[in-house]
Regions:
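Short Gly/Thr-rich strand-loop-strand
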Residues: 73-77, 150-195
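N-terminal export and membrane-targeting signals
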Residues: 1-13
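Short, surface-exposed beta-strand/loop micro-motifs that present aromatic residues
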Residues: 114-118, 196-203
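A short acidic-to-branched-hydrophobic micro-motif
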Residues: 110-144
Length: 237
């Protein structure tokens, strides 16, 4: 069976990538940690590209052999293929409609996968994005809203149906908030190889970090590890 990726890939790279991974979570909403250095100088937009992990670091986390498929300075948009707009935040990272009217100023995103030899077969994929806000308080406010949004979309079934392709259904799990990082996991229904995805989101200073990782044999917290490694670089700047 052709494995499908997060729905974010539908509109990117002229539909060169397969959409899918609608991640949704549950649990009790909890506020972001606002005890951090909110007066810290904001990370500049010019520094965003350097925050994304390089392929070597991402491959070390997943135990994979991925390469960068593309980079983007635009939000992704899965609103035309995802079954429930109110839970579009769970369709994948950096969704245009999810971040609309939240005050963000810039985004940098990147897709990595290992499908270069056969575009129909992917063992692993990662989408990572960093989104800048004018202030740390605005970034934390988005994180708090995301905790509530992911909770409202928890433990449910969602469908992604891109034009001309079979629909893909995802069974979603509960959400977890550990150390200021929000995470969830989901499994593709009917997958012959146990294809599943993880999501993670956190905020550091004025930056929101939004990550998705997919694979048949994902390490336990791959998406969280990617997000936290990005966050660590922001903290030390």
């Amino acid at each position: 069976m052709v494995r499908r990726q997060f729905a974010i890939a539908v509109q990117a790279a002229v539909c060169a990538l397969t959409p899918g991974c609608t991640t949704v979570v549950g649990g009790s909403p909890a506020p972001a940690d606002t005890r951090g250095p909110l007066s810290q100088a904001p990370v500049a937009v010019t520094a965003l590209d350097a925050l994304l992990l390089d392929d070597r670091k991402v491959n070390d986390i997943l135990g994979a052999g991925m390469r960068v498929r593309y980079r983007t300075q635009d939000m992704w948009d899965s609103s035309q293929t995802f079954s429930e707009r109110s839970c579009l935040a769970m369709a994948g990272p950096a969704q245009q409609a999810v971040y609309a009217d939240t005050g963000w100023t810039a985004v940098r995103g990147e897709r990595l996968d290992d499908s270069y030899d056969d575009p129909n077969v992917r063992n692993d994929s990662v989408n990572q994005a960093v989104i800048a806000y004018p202030t740390a308080r605005q970034a934390n406010a988005f994180y708090d809203a995301s905790v509530r949004r992911w909770s409202a979309c928890a433990n449910r079934r969602f469908v992604d149906h891109p034009p001309g392709q079979p629909e893909v259904a995802w069974a979603v799990a509960d959400s977890h908030k550990v150390g200021g990082t929000l995470s969830t996991s989901e499994e593709q229904e009917g997958s012959e190889d146990g294809w599943r995805c993880q999501r993670a989101l956190t905020a550091r200073n004025n930056i929101v970090i939004d990550v998705a990782a997919c694979g048949s044999f994902l390490p336990g917290a791959a998406a969280v590890d990617v997000a936290q490694q990005i966050a660590a670089a922001i903290v030390t700047r």
